[in-house]
Amino acid sequence: LHKDIEKSELRFALGIPGSMTLRTLGITDTEHANSRWNEHLLKYKSRIRLFDGIPQLLGNLKMNGYQLGIVTSKTRNEYTTDFAVPFALSDYFCTVICVEDTLRPKPFPEPLLSYLNASHINAENAIYIGDTIYDSQCAQKAGVDFGFAAWGNAATQGVQADYLFKRPADIPFSLIKS
């Protein structure tokens, strides 16, 4: 692109596949650009941290019988190298749906519907917790309640949520109450 892009102009990219972001930015060789992106990510990988309370939250939910899964816009390779391996959280999740597992990514409902099908869960017995408008739209289109994880995201415009979680510790309390 050879141009500076303001951080605020890139908010749209949070929660959609990298290839979709690159095409939106006018980049045609998305394979090369994605490769470069992943190379740069490796340089800063050690700075990436989980939000406080996430391991405790996942342990608490699993211990209380909740079936946990992930629906992500990351590729399976990105999920493995950026999340599963560095944070050692894979044991908490029964099913992981990555971008290449369905034909249409979030905000379409297919990834979440695929998760529900693979996990043998009805939409009315599920809650999808996410932090982007694309997560909200995906849940709404799939007929699943949506919990907005607002602790790390200032971009709430347009997000429709059944639950608002201001910090990870709010999640179990909210689920038990309902």
Give the label of every model feature segment:
Residues 44-48, 73, 105:
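Transmembrane alpha-helical core positions of polytopic small-molecule transporters
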